[in-house]
Amino acid sequence: MPGSSRQSGREAGSALLSLQQEDQENVNPEKAAPDQRARAALKTGNARGNAPQQRLKARRVAPLKDLSINDEHVASGPSWKAASKQPAFTIHVDEEEDTQKIPPEHKEMRCEDALAFNAAVSLPGARKPLVPLDYPMDGSFESPHAMDMSIVLEEEKPVSVNEVPDYHEDIHTYLREMEIKCKPKVGYMKKQPDITNSMRAILVDWLVEVGEEYKLQNETLHLAVNYIDRFLSSMSVLRGKLQLVGTAAMLLASKFEEIYPPEVAEFVYITDDTYSKKQVLRMEHLVLKVLAFDLAAPTVNQFLNQYFLHQQPANCKVESLAMFLGELSLIDADPYLKYLPSLIAGAAFHLALYTVTGQSWPESLVQKTGYTLESLKPCLMDLHQTYLRAAQHTQQSIREKYKHSKYHGVSLLNPPETLNV
């Protein structure tokens, strides 16, 4: 009979279930047989339906922190949780069946409630933008790093050591004293048996090209010419060694003035290997001995940098033209060896100022230097003649140098026909 068969089946099932429960109470879940654990877990799973299996399938890529199991949960949870060693069931039961856990939304609510009691740690509200999002940003709002870079690009001209008001007078007095000590002999070329002024002019013109090739400072060129003249004032040199003297002088000047002077091998190279490295170093040693290691010689360039501070207002073209005229005076030993560098610088500054702006030697420099326009006149007349003949001079390296935009093309300016003296 169907009814009796169903009833007997239910009784047999309940008996079997009670036996399984007794086995679970008497057997350690960790040592239970695999088939018993599987049957218990499967039976419980069937009793709960298919929803847990679907949730398990979605949790298989859970973070590692979700795989940890608490001992308390194992002891207090259903028996089949501890019995099963399948990761999927463990993940599912640990998340879903533990009624003691606080849902994430409850945790957030409790944290917010706790923070709400303390105003000092309360979370701020949503911030609003200070300006509309579509408002165009002003170009002045730049990052500090970008502003620093722009400042560096604008300040291309290095700060002069002469621009120290507290020491202007002391610096000028010291330079005026040293220029007398470091002045070459006026007529030394007459005592040279094998070289002439024209050979010296060719050497200086070549040194101008060397300075441009290696991007050396103008001061380096002025120092090198001073070393050459002082050396030739004391030593007789054959024409075959004159370039060696100039190379050693340029090497010394670059070591004294430049941050990164060219290597000795570079100076050997620019002589087209006419001299060896050993010869250059030996000549450098000899020049140092003859000069008594006095390398800090005042130059026309140094005095010009002092005179430029007295421009009202400052004019870059005047400065470039004065530097051009100062370098022209390096080419010809006669007549410029008889003038002090401070006097040549004064004549160059006045001639440049007059050519560009029509102004004259300022009164502030009369008080500072003691040079009046009348005292500058002899040197000024010689420099004016040199300026007029510069385009026809045999040596053209200085004119080519000052044609560049870096120096505002001042060598292309027409010199004045007359002077206001």
Curated annotation (Swiss-Prot):
SMART domains: CYCLIN, Cyclin_C. Polyubiquitinated via 'Lys-11'-linked ubiquitin by the anaphase-promoting complex (APC/C), leading to its degradation by the proteasome. Deubiquitinated and stabilized by USP37 enables entry into S phase. Ubiquitinated during the G1 phase by the SCF(FBXO31) complex, leading to its proteasomal degradation. Gene3D superfamilies: Cyclin-like. GO terms for molecular function: cyclin-dependent protein serine/threonine kinase regulator activity; protein domain specific binding; protein kinase binding. Its main location: nucleus. The keyword Metal-binding does not apply. It comes from the Eukaryota. GO terms for cellular component: cyclin A2-CDK1 complex; cyclin A2-CDK2 complex; cyclin-dependent protein kinase holoenzyme complex; cytoplasm; cytosol; female pronucleus; male pronucleus; nucleoplasm. Residues 1-60 are annotated as: Disordered. InterPro entries: Cyclin (IPR039361), Cyclin-A_N (IPR032447), Cyclin-like_dom (IPR013763), Cyclin-like_sf (IPR036915), Cyclin_A/B-like (IPR046965), Cyclin_C-dom (IPR004367), Cyclin_N (IPR006671), Cyclins_cyclin-box (IPR048258). The modification Phosphoserine is found at S5. Keywords: Acetylation, Cell cycle, Cell division, Cyclin, Cytoplasm, Mitosis, Nucleus, Phosphoprotein, Ubl conjugation. PANTHER family: CYCLINS. Interacts with the CDK1 and CDK2 protein kinases to form serine/threonine kinase holoenzyme complexes. Interacts with CDK1 (hyperphosphorylated form in G1 and underphosphorylated forms in S and G2). Interacts with CDK2; the interaction increases from G1 to G2. Interacts (associated with CDK2 but not with CDK1) with SCAPER; regulates the activity of CCNA2/CDK2 by transiently maintaining CCNA2 in the cytoplasm. Forms a ternary complex with CDK2 and CDKN1B; CDKN1B inhibits the kinase activity of CDK2 through conformational rearrangements. Interacts with INCA1. Belongs to the cyclin family. Cyclin AB subfamily. This is Cyclin-A2. It comes from Mesocricetus auratus.
